[in-house]
C-alpha cells in the first residue's frame, strides 16, 4: 500500500487539505501504476518546521511503497 505523507508549515483550510490529499492520491496512483484504492495520503498543516535556518513556507513529503 503506497503511503504519501505531506507536512507543511502553511495553514490550509479543511477543504484545501482534502483537495490536496485527493489530488496527491490520484498522482501517486498514476505515477506508481497502482490502483488508487490501495493508496493512502495524509496532510498535516500548520506544523512547526524549519529548513536551512528559515521557517518560510515549506513542505516535507515522504513516500513509502513496497512492491
What does each of the following model-derived ranges do?
Residues 1-67:
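Interaction-mediating elements
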Amino acid at each position: 500500500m503506497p503511503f504519501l505523507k505531506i507536512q507543511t508549515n502553511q495553514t490550509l483550510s479543511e477543504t484545501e487539505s482534502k483537495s490536496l490529499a485527493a489530488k496527491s492520491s490520484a498522482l501517486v496512483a498514476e505515477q506508481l501504476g497502482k490502483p488508487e484504492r490501495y493508496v493512502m495520503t495524509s496532510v498535516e498543516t500548520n506544523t512547526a518546521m524549519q529548513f536551512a535556518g528559515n521557517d518560510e513556507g515549506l513542505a516535507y513529503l515522504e513516500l513509502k511503497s513496497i512492491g
